[in-house]
Amino acid sequence: MHARKILQSAAVLALSAALTLPAGPAQAAAGPNTDFNGDGYNDLAVGSPSYPGYPGTKNSGLVAVLFGGPDGLTYNRHIIRPAPGCTAGGLPCEAWGVNLSAADVDADGRTDLISRGHYDLQVDSWTSQGTATIERRVYGHRTAPWRLMSGQFDDQPGTDIVGPTRGGYWFSVGGWYNRSANLLFTDFADDSYLTKETSAASGDLDGDGKLEIAVVAGRHSGAGELGPHLWLIDDPHRPQVQLTTLGSPSTCTSPPSYGQGCPKADSEVAMGNVNGDGHDDLVMLTPSTASLQVWYGRATGPSSAPGYTVDLSSLATSAELGPGLAVGDVNGDGWAEIVIGASKATVSGHSEAGAVMVIPGSATGPVIKRAQLVTQDGIGPVGGTALADPIAEQSKPGDRFGQAITITDLTGDGKGEVIVGAPAKNGGSGMLAVLFGSATGVLTSTAQAIHPSRYGLNSTQAYFGGVLLK
């Protein structure tokens, strides 16, 4: 028999008005191209920065590339890990897989994997001849992009590898532009001294073909008020980087009100096309206020205020929410779903077993009343009883199901799979759950439960599923 399911208050139905779903979204958003081996199916990269190294080495970490197919993740995999004796700047290589990104770095028409450790970064490329590391960069621990992002960020040809970088007491944005060998950071236009970067995401909000960066960070000094801010950065390569403020302490009310951005130190951001208009939208989850906010993209850039705000406290407590957050089209209708993790949620009496909520998108934004609640014990409507249990596992205390989430179309059917990490499961070895996309949302008849032992990874220090490529 199945364990008792989470029951959520029916009051969630009052969180949003009834929304109609007009046809004709401008653009689907099933997820990025992560087909590394060129077989027509997207693949998944999983970072395991705490994985033990070879005998006599530190916990040097690794990256497992798991290949997709018509039935989901296959048994085929490629493991990237430091070789014995690997050093970076005179220090042992460690924490490989702490951050991941993907882009066509060498302009050969095929997606490459970018992964970093504490002191180094490398780009791996797949060709018909096999896999090769085409770039390797060594840097100091305090000059590494904390969140890897890759793609076209400036107006010059070539792939950029950039991200927010956290130093001892400072924060900046920069990296390698257009395959340059030089690491470049530019100053902020208002001479701000920023610190405590907590989350970042990239996407094309204005539809100009270049990516923007959204980042949650604290302002320590400089022009403006102190405290957590949500900033939008357009072209971080430009001298004197411009910061567009979308939220700050002065825009916060309690509880968060419609039309006001309210970033906190625990806010998480992601991007995707929620309303199907061809522009990415900026989504922010703030666990401490149990709120979800969306800034809609448009040709002139997003409005300074969110176009959608909702109180999530009827779905989960603030202590349960986060940090998992992903945006992508699960049902193939052209409107991206928002998937929220509640990794510390109590499920079937088990503390911190974890759950995720899949919130459909529409032409008018998220549709909270049609959300699905997913645990290892079942799937069903929020506020109701689970109707099916496709995951061949049960919730256990401390699993942290929903700690990390990504949405990728592994099967090639135009519908994104929701891939959920439970990194603390089975004593820390971890697990992935692949929830298949379907026309009605997450498929309730079948799912994949992926254990690292399937790929020869048997350490209880793997925390498999804690870092996922987005």
Label each region the model flagged:
Residues 44-46, 63-66, 96, 113, ...:
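Hydrophobic strand positions within the blades of repeat-based beta-sheet folds
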Residues 50-55, 120-121, 167-169, 219-224, ...:
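Short glycine/acidic-enriched loop and turn motifs that connect beta-strands
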Residues 29-41, 97-105, 146-154, 159, ...:
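Beta-propeller blade termini
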Residues 13, 17-30, 67-95, 123-147, ...:
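Blade-edge motifs of beta-propeller repeat domains
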Residues 27-79, 86, 100, 162, ...:
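An edge-strand/N-cap motif at the start of beta-rich repeat modules
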Residues 1-11:
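Bacterial N-terminal signal peptides that target proteins for export
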Residues 38-47, 107-116, 155-164, 207-216, ...:
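Acidic/hydrophobic-patterned starts of short beta strands in beta-sheet-rich repeat architectures
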Residues 57-62, 120, 225-229, 289-291, ...:
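A detector of repeated loop/turn-to-beta-strand junctions in beta-rich toroidal repeat architectures
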